[in-house]
Amino acid sequence: MKFFALFIYRPVATILISIAITLCGVLGFRLLPVAPLPQVDFPVIMVSASLPGASPETMASSVATPLERSLGRIAGVSEMTSSSSLGSTRIILQFNFDRDINGAARDVQAAINAAQSLLPSGMPSRPTYRKANPSDAPIMILTLTSDTWSQGELYDFASTQLAQTIAQIDGVGDVDVGGSSLPAVRVGLNPQALFNQGVSLDDVRSAISNANVRKPQGAIDDKTHRWQVQTNDELKTATEYQPLIIHYNNGAAVRLGDVATVTDSVQDVRNAGMTNAKPAILLMIRKLPEANIIQTVDSIREKLPELQTLIPASIDLQIAQDRSPTIRASLEEVEQTLVISVALVILVVFLFLRSGRATLIPAVAVPVSLIGTFAAMYLCGFSLNNLSLMALTIATGFVVDDAIVVLENISRHLEAGMKPLQAALQGTREVGFTVLSMSLSLVAVFLPLLLMGGLPGRLLREFAVTLSVAIGISLLVSLTLTPMMCGWMLKSSKPREQTRSRGFGRLLTGLQQGYGTSLKWVLNHTRLVGVVLLGTIALNIWLYISIPKTFFPEQDTGVLMGGIQADQSISFQAMRGKLQDFMKIIRDDPAVDNVTGFTGGSRVNSGMMFITLKSRGERHETAQQVIDRLRVALAKEPGANLFLMAVQDIRVGGRQANASYQYALLSDDLSALREWEPKIRKALAALPQLADVNSDQQDNGAEMNLIYDRETMSRLGIDVQAANSLLNNAFGQRQISTIYQPMNQYKVVMEVDSRYTQDISALEKMFVINSDGKAIPLSYFAKWQPANAPLSVNHQGLSAASTIAFNLPTGTSLSEATEAINRAMTQLGVPSTVRGSFAGTAQVFQETMNSQVILILAAIATVYIVLGILYESYVHPLTILSTLPSAGVGALLALELFNAPFSLIALIGIMLLIGIVKKNAIMMVDFALEAQRNGNLTPEQAIFQACLLRFRPIMMTTLAALFGALPLVISGGDGSELRQPLGITIVGGLVMSQLLTLYTTPVVYLFFDRLRLRFSRNNSQPESITEP
């Protein structure tokens, strides 16, 4: 009593405390960062290594395996995958959530150093690492185009000037430059001219290497001066290399230009990048795992004017893709939804109270509670994101509940003629415990979420804490500010029955009278109600088992990614044509705003595309509908496939797959994996629950297998090293020298000119100079035959691995897809040597599925414990929790009605319903117990009276929660796919629970009371009957 009086009789202090809470919230709001979702990125580090010309199998065995053995010893590595292709290896390390990315990077560098002695000596550079996830979609893509600059010059400018500057911006993890390669002097050899002059390819390589040497020459000193010695020992351009003497034939000088075409070109001619229909260089910017996407993008945009000053007028720099506009639009939508929810909740309160002055009291509690929450969010390191703002939207219906309960009870005393301050004090004292019980039991629902680990726990933590803080502030406001305002603003009035004669008041009176009549009938047919209650429990179980499930709602971010997978024997020229064809098909779609793409590098038969869709206001289709439409047109392109997927704010794992979900096959027997992977992929592709099924196992590339005749080689004076060096010199784009420039270093690249490698007959033109100085054709000591070879070799851990990626057809849930895959694997009878498991997002979904029921039961158990402590009873918490089955049925039926799968967002809704619907029972049980104790009423009379007296606040609080969630259901625009499942779940659960719990709760109350009475009699303790 003294606690409440302290605030009621000191209005100035109470108001100032509320203002202080509000001001702290305003300050916190201005300081909070903005993000699409809570920070849930796994710490990921990518290790890269190269050995030009090495086959994928060589890269896997000699480079990937030693590194994997060393990296695998690092603490906190949750998953390690690698992919080795022609001349390159990429290892992806995913760490546990609690692993610091900077500490992990130091351990990675130490592991690379430890493995250095086991790596091949011919590697041009040490392995490097980056703190970025290559499977993440870029947060921004910049393009460079020019009508006068070559692609190599643009690439050089982008990598040496722009990429270096952008990489230094806070939050940027990686800047990947694509579309070409660094400038280089290319030496295209003429094998016939070399044969005629008697010059071997090794002679050419040695001559070029020896002619371009950068060594210190020292200095000369005399008594008064010092001169540095400098020579023209470096050659920098193709023009300078052409007259280079590489050999003497019968006294005549043989110059490089006589046997080769020397050009200023690029290191790797098998690269191409495009934006819309124009050749371009792409700068693909990815953020650090712990960075905020909006802050990082804003920092890049702030830097762009400075970058523009570095760019010549003949180069056009454009932002081809920026993920932040849709994120900002989504947050604006949810902020508007929050405002609408607040307005609807206040409107509900006004309809019930029919007084502007009375409505103002709970209306003040809403902004104070919501705004004050921002301060706690800032202190906890949270952000303004879709989930935290949805928590505040839902909180509008909660934070007003406590004020409504207090206000309604004080109003009842005022109508009985009590003075305002006395009514405020008495009314608050009567319902103080009720309000405390409702708030603490609601917060208790979220305790299991706070203790939940992994990605789901990280994702839901901000939601749970934000909502809990809002409820806590609401509890404080409803027990301090609300009674103070009631005591000083409201006046004694006539009973409601005399003032409510029309409109909504008459409707509410009629409902209350009808409820009283129907409740009498129900209390006389309790067995039927018991059957209904048991039926809802069974229906809950059946609906949960049968409803389609997914991990997270599919988002429409307005950005698509596409992976091109062509025939494994396709040439680069043909692949570049496929890229152009695919880009034209996509560019012609009316929903597409911009498209960029690139191909080439170590995997000639693959490419990537990034597609920006028009804003939601400019297109009538969702991203998935655009993909479905494009899939039909893209399927008509022969010889290659383009797999499209909508970019999501949550992507788990480091695999660069061509679809949203993955199923990984592992085996210690590579031959078994290669035998069974095509069978499994074919079986999965036939499933109607899957779409765009593809695999990263590519072991049917065209290969020309050379077989040496070692006896002939020995007789001719040729060793294997010389033969292998010949092939590397001829076909490996061998980097044979380095050109040092002030801004960068460039390579001299040697290979047989492409004019002489149009078919396999090029091998017949190759020769080796033996130990006697004679030119021996390759065909003299080797024969060749076509064969199949892998284009890539993949590992997970230290096992051979293959990843089958898939998308979901429209209308199919992830649970249906995973169940279909498990059935298919069982039917195929895959041997134990090949192990299959879901990876990435699908793996997290499986883990979440296994813990959902446990999480719900833990929440219920926590609420029971809290209520049991508050009521000092084992029985009354069960009465209150009996409201939950009807809410679960309503939520699951609503999801089925709207064809929405049960996702992590819907799980949040279920958890919220556990806290919401029990409020009705708490208000009934509290008043029934009070009536039994102080009114000398029978249990039947007490619960009946409690139901009638609390009907009005129950209706008010339920409608406030329902209208607070309703905007989530009907909202459209960006991000609506995240908001709607939450709103659907809550609205469905509230409607069903309101219809049933008004009748089931009193029946359950009487059942447990009779059970308690019978138990007390059996134990000869009749005195305990009257105890609460």
UniProtKB/Swiss-Prot annotation:
It comes from the Bacteria. GO terms for cellular component: plasma membrane. Gene3D superfamilies: Multidrug efflux transporter AcrB pore domain (3.30.70.1440), Multidrug efflux transporter AcrB pore domain like (3.30.70.1320), Multidrug efflux transporter AcrB TolC docking domain, DN and DC subdomains (3.30.2090.10), Multidrug efflux transporter AcrB transmembrane domain (1.20.1640.10). SUPFAM superfamilies: Multidrug efflux transporter AcrB pore domain, PN1, PN2, PC1 and PC2 subdomains (SSF82693), Multidrug efflux transporter AcrB TolC docking domain, DN and DC subdomains (SSF82714), Multidrug efflux transporter AcrB transmembrane domain (SSF82866). Pfam families: ACR_tran. Part of a tripartite efflux system composed of MdtA, MdtB and MdtC. MdtC forms a heteromultimer with MdtB. Belongs to the resistance-nodulation-cell division (RND) (TC 2.A.6) family. MdtC subfamily. This is Multidrug resistance protein MdtC. It comes from Citrobacter koseri (strain ATCC BAA-895 / CDC 4225-83 / SGSC4696). The lineage of its organism: Bacteria, Pseudomonadati, Pseudomonadota, Gammaproteobacteria, Enterobacterales. The gene is mdtC.
